[in-house]
Amino acid sequence: MRPPAPPGGSPPRNFLLREVGPRLESPAFSTCQVDFYFVESENIVKIFCGSSNQPLAKSICASIGLELGDCTVDAFPDGETFVKINENVRGEDVFLVQSTSPPTNHHLMEMFIMMDALRRASASRITAVLPFYGYARQDRKDQPRVPITAKLVANLLVAAGANRVLTMDLHAQQIQGFFDIPVDHLYAAPVIYEYLKKKALTDLVVVSPDVGGLKMAHAYSTTLEVGLAIVAKRRKNATEVESMAVIGEIRGKNVLLVDDLTETAGTLTAAATLLRKKGAKKIYACVSHAILNEMGIQRLRKSNIDELITTDTVLRPAIDGVKITTLSVAGLLGEAIKRINSNSSVTSLFELKGSRTS
């Protein structure tokens, strides 16, 4: 039987069902009358962050009108991480923002410890928000006796207490299948599209710097309604390219190189050199995650790339001698958090014109 609604109306959408009066446990009472009443329950959102990208976490909070959660993240003299959650999270919907960018292992361990603290503090749900998912390039066994570390990270996130994952531009989309919990995989592309439309570039061709990025490049070219080309390459090893060739017409065109991430910038700068030799005019590079170690910075300074367009998924210091435009994905992540909390669909956040990407 449905319990009665409160006087004057139907029960609220979010409610707790409570009994009025003592529970009768004696077998002598096979039937009894029990009254119920509805108590409205707020599905409170709290957002916390580790040390990897606090500016992004604060921007996410600002985009949805929340304060960043209060926690202490420190280290003991021997280097061990110490975490304390400084406010009540019992029964609340918690989102933990942490990019697993370099130092990757430190940021991962910090995240595991924070999730353990939140779980032990009785948070009702913990969503791991990873704007950048580290170890994503180790997604398969491509050599004998090597690990699949992307899967190991997925296992560890769940073991630490994650009930859901929100991430952006995974290096390999199949990583979503490494989890047995819900994964919401967003794309930075809508934010980047808006910037490119404002630039109003003419004679533009989208170029994938390798075969693996062709699907992403196709989505860009379809949305921007421009041509598509690809740089085919043969690798000597993980950091060196042996030979490259351009498939498509780029002579006299402005070029947009697109990729999900760059660290050493070897692929991007080598492709830019080849494209300039083949007659490209201005060369723009667009990556969701610009990790950029010292080698990558030096390569960009000497490269033919006129502008590097990226996002704030990874925190990095200012770099002299390279034109870098950083776009914020805080609004996109904030909207996803609102929808997840209210059990609304996030589908429209990862659907791109001409290509459903997830």
Predicted regions and their residues:
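PRPP-associated nucleotide enzymes
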Residues: 1-20, 24-358
